[in-house]
Amino acid sequence: MRLITLFLILASLPLHAQKAPKTKALIKLTPIEVATEDRVYKRTPQGELKLHFFKPKGGLQIAVQRPCVVFFFGGGWKSGSYLQFVPQAEYLASRGIIAACADYRISSIHKTTPDKAVEDAKSAIRWVRGHADEIGVDPTKIIAAGGSAGGHLAACTALVTAYDAESDDKNISAKPNALVLFNPAMNIATLFRERAAEQNPVKMDVAEAITPNNFVTKDTPPAILFFGTADQLKIGGDEFVQKARALGLRAEMWAAPEMPHGFFNKAPWMQVTARQMDVFLTSLNYLGGEPTIRLPEGAPSLIAE
């Protein structure tokens, strides 16, 4: 019963925290203006998919290869928009990282299933790495990031070896070099197994094949995860961290006391989690100096687990 409730929480996200606004995000994490650019990274039978780039102001200096982060929005693989992670993308661009918010196929618009979204996420990472020289990206410093269903997709780019699009150049790796995951869905096979088969968007063999926790290996990149302690999806996050640490890997878990799923979408937790993301990326030498983000007065603290 607990797992059924968990799935219902995930599936309902388009109506609540994970539904991105249809207008520009109101929260600004930096006063610094950044450059923007849209690039089509994939053409599918259901339409074009874009990467919405946010770059350090003044244009790219191609001689300088910068880290790049690709954000995937949440929405239960049903709905959502790249706009969800615009605040974080703008902030990281202001700090010198090239950031991109990715489109991917969702059921409400494209009538597709989660495995197609996995294909799209891997295609997005491959596009960035394959065009690294053109867009000024260091191909050894690519970060996959996302929230909820988007966190699941980001994790899949690092862990899932199946579900590569036929149009992809398989000689280009889709594996990112680091993960930033906001309450990701890491154990979807367990969730789907507790439901009636006709209620699941994919069959169980597909669910197993796109469950990140099934594929944690010594090659898993360093990861940081954010969860509210009241979020039942945290069970899967804890499982991932346990598996990664057992292999001697770096996997950080930061918990927001008594907070529900999607807590990071609103102030003050958006600022708090973004600052910790900055600290993590600085520790990997993807950023330099101190975080420039200002925390609201009396902002709460995350707990390291």
Segments and roles (model prediction):
Residues 19-64, 217:
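N-terminal cap/lid segment of alpha/beta-hydrolase-fold proteins
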Residues 52, 226, 232, 238-305:
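C-terminal catalytic histidine-bearing segment of alpha/beta-hydrolase fold enzymes
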Residues 63-75:
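Short beta-strand element of the alpha/beta-hydrolase
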Residues 68, 91-103, 143, 178, ...:
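A fold-wide structural signal in alpha/beta-hydrolase
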Residues 72-74, 128, 227-228:
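The conserved beta1-alpha1 loop
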Residues 81-82, 88, 102-139, 266-273:
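Catalytic nucleophile-loop/oxyanion-hole region of alpha/beta-hydrolase
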Residues 83, 123-197, 203, 207-208, ...:
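Primarily recognizes the serine-hydrolase "nucleophile elbow" in alpha/beta-hydrolase
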Residues 219, 224-228:
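Short beta-strand/loop motif that positions the catalytic acidic residue
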